[in-house]
Amino acid sequence: MRLSTQNQFKGTIVEVDIGTVMAIVRVRLDGGDHVVTSSVTKDAVLNLDLKEGQPATVFIKASAVIIGVE
């Protein structure tokens, strides 16, 4: 599969927390202690059969990133 997304990070799923409609998926990136947390639909988790310990690639759309500071 080829994608236009430039921000691609390989890692391992460390947590899947499924709610009623949405789910939180945490992926520890390879080569460090950084964890990316993503909110996805429950259906996406079930369709992709996401499980802890499974390798995954995180794709981040640059125009959709929000950064905040205090």
What are these regions (language model features)?
Residues 1-70:
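Non-catalytic connector elements of ABC transporters
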